[in-house]
Structures are given as C-alpha cells and as structure tokens.
Amino acid sequence: MEKIFNYINGELVEPLNNQWLDNYNPSIGEVYSLIPDSTKEDVENAQKAAKNAFPIWINSTIKERATVLQRIADLILERQDDLAFAESVDNGKPLALAKKVDIPRAATNMSFFASAILHENSESHQMSQVAINYTLRKPIGVVGCISPWNLPLYLFTWKIAPALATGNTVVAKPSEITPMTAFLFSKICIDAGLPKGVLNIVHGLGPKVGYEITKHPNIKAISFTGGTLTGQKIAEVAAPMFKKLSLELGGKNPNIIFADCDLEKAVSSSVLSSFSNQGQICLCGSRIFIERKIYKVFKEKFLIKVKSLTIGDPLEKSSKIGALVSQQHMEKVLTHIEIAKKDGGVLLAGGNKFIPEGRCSNGYFLEPTVFEGLSYDCSTNQEEIFGPVVTLTPFDSEEEVLNFANSTKYGLCSMVWTSDLKRANRMSLKLDSGIVWINCWLVRDLRTPFGGMKESGVGREGGSYALNFFTETTNVCISYD
C-alpha cells in the first residue's frame, strides 16, 4: 500500500516513530494509503530545518524567490491531471471540479504571489524641514500554516505562497483526512529546486502535529483555516505567546434573493453556492432567503435543478455531486438532517444517504437536501453543517432579512441578488460579512481581502493583506539635520 511521507529539510522521510494512519478513499469507503502519525519529535525536526534555512532564504533576492515560486506554479500545471485525480480520490469531489477549480487555482496562488513581491510598494512620509520616514517590511522567521480538507491543495498553497514569497520559512500541516496532494506538492518542490528546509510538511493528527506547531516557541505566526472550535483552541495556545494569528473559520452564509433579481441567474447560481463540493465550502450559501412575492416560483425552479443533479462516482464526467469526505462527516450531516426534521422542517428534496451502482456502493454519498418551514433561529439555520443541506425561508422586507442574515455567530460572506444598486449598497453596508457578493458567487480577485467577522475568524488573507501578515513592520525616521 502506498505510503505518504513527511517533507523535512528537503527530504521525504518516514515519521520517527514509524507509526501510520489509514487514509480513506471516501468514494469507495476503503483505505488506499497510509500517512505518518507524526509526533512532537517530527515537528521539532521540521522547525529546526526551517530555522536553519531562514538565513539562506531571507538573503535570497526577491527575484530568486519569485523564480522558484513560479517554477512550482508551472509544475503544478504540468502535472494537473495527476493532481486532479489524486484530489478527487482523496477528497471525494468530482474529478471535473478538481480539474477546473482546485488545481488551476493552486497554481494561480503560487504565480500570483511570485508576481506580487516583484511589484510591492513601500511607504514614505515626509515631515517638512524635519525628517523623512520610510517603512521596512521584514519576514517574521519560521511560521506555521495549517490547512483544511475541503479544498486541500488550493488552500494549502493559499497559505504557503505568501509566507514563502515574503522570505519566511514554513512548517506546514495539511489535513490528515486529505493529505495526498500536499505529498505530491512536496515532490514538486524538490523538482523545482526549492532550497532544503524552506518548506517542511509534517503529516498527522491535529491534536498532535497541529498542537505542537501552534505551541512551539520558534514558530512565530500561525495561519489556520478550519473549524471555529479548532480556531479557538489555537488562539488559546498562541495568543498568550503573542504570536501573529490569521484564522479563517466557519460560516453560515445567507443567500438573499430579492424579487427584482435576474431570477434564472439567481436560481442557477444558488444551486452552485448550495451544493458545490457537496456543500463542503466555507463560502456556501446554506441559508437561502427569498422575497415572499417570488418565493413559490423560485422554489419550483430551484428544486427542478437540484433534483437533476447527478450523484455518483467522482471519476465519471457526468457526476456533479461526489462523496462526502469521510464516514464520520457523513454521519454528522445525517444527524443534522434528523434534527431539522424534528424541529418541524419540511423536506423538499434529498435527506437520505445515496448508494451509487458499481464500485462506489460503499462510499459516503448524500442526496442534496432542501428544507423549508424552519425558523431563522433554529439550530439548522444557526450551526455550520458543512454539507449538502440548505434551507429556504421567505421574507417581506430588507429590515426583516437583515435580521435573519445577521442572526448567527458567523460573518464570513453573503450573497445578494437584486437589480437595485442602491439596495445593493445598503445591504452591503449592513450585512455582518467579510465578503458580500452582489449578483454572483465565488468570484475571486486574489488582490482583495478574504476573511470574516465575528466567529468566522481573525484577520484577512489575499493580496497585500497576506503579504503584510507574514511580515513585521519597521519605521525608519531620518532627520534632515
């Protein structure tokens, strides 16, 4: 059986304890590879390698760093088919989605930040007849990057690219549930000529590896994407140590449909924002609020499209809905579905485990599920389910839907569908969201800030925000006298 290895000091190495964890293919429900069950000692070796590599990496020129990152981006695209296949097998997502979104965006992350550091501006402030100030931005040193299982390579590169670009060295932990593309990425780094120790990847469990990365005194910053509860635990450990923290956490995002919208576009996009990646995207719009005068027609059109989605083998071109990432996660989502039923939810579509014919009959598949008749403040509309489950709720006014939308502890993103520009501006101002999409969803410009309010996280990623996070600022004041 294939083994995944840690990537430490430029080498692919076994865990020091020679202990391994099972890695499942969720579409067939079987173990297909083994990953390191790494411990404190592996993290220690990784941080030592990163610490030793830092003087070399920081003294490389910006152009040299950019060249290596761009070479990595090019190799990702050259190996796109292999990476997409690995992502689909490891995660359960449709192969077509991995080819179209995950892998190309991973390459774009690397190339974007390779280019960004070549065009970054510095600041200066002149004090008339007195002095001039200018600002230096310096890499932090060794930083930790912990990435999730839903968009494995995409979000892994989203973190390490700006960290490396700004001159830091990295100890990274990909999710133990979907480690394969990070392992393949380590081979790409070797082939691209990334200096030894600049990036170190330690596989294993969060309570072991993630905890050790978070609490290590030589790791000066933590960038984490994942669940809110895990983010809280990271903050509890890292904050007293005065580490820089970037936490991109959960979401329970409202999708608001006004009567004056482009209905066909709103319906089609709402299907995507509900069920892409089996609803396992922090940006999915799981609470759909529809202005009452178009509620019935929206519901009819939406359900027709939902019921036409093809569920099945992720490797088949026709499959739009793949497997959930694990049996444990599938059971969690099924529990939420039962809670929604007990709370009086009317099941309009789905609600059951799906058993495909053929090789995937033991996989972790769920039907896309739609409820109506639930109160805006019930647990289904308040807790992040992170699966193919959405609710439909009518509203009568802007004031009412704003109350619905802002009622959760989360504040990651919102979608608003309207042809009224003034309304769009009013809603954007009043929604508790780090991102507001007007008449679209998941349109991303990597220069823009990405992150949420409330319990959806701390800080922002993307563009200059990411570059600033991974650097420390020094102001230099020079007297004219």
List where the protein language model places each region.
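Terminal low-complexity tails and localization/encapsulation signals of metabolic enzymes
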Residues: 1-34, 67, 71, 121-146, ...
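Conserved C-terminal structural/oligomerization subdomain of aldehyde/semialdehyde dehydrogenase
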Residues: 28-34, 219, 256, 310, ...
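Residue-level signal for inorganic ion chemistry
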Residues: 29, 65, 87, 110, ...
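Glycine-rich loop-to-alpha-helix module at the N-terminal edge of alpha/beta enzyme cores
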Residues: 30-120, 130
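Short, well-ordered beta-strand elements within core beta-sheets of diverse protein domains
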Residues: 31-38, 52-59, 145, 255-258, ...
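Structural signal for hydrophobic packing residues in well-ordered secondary-structure cores
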Residues: 54, 58, 73-80, 84, ...
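Rossmann-like NAD(P) dinucleotide-binding subdomain of oxidoreductase/dehydrogenase enzymes
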Residues: 122-265, 395
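ALDH superfamily catalytic-core signature
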Residues: 221, 229-375, 438
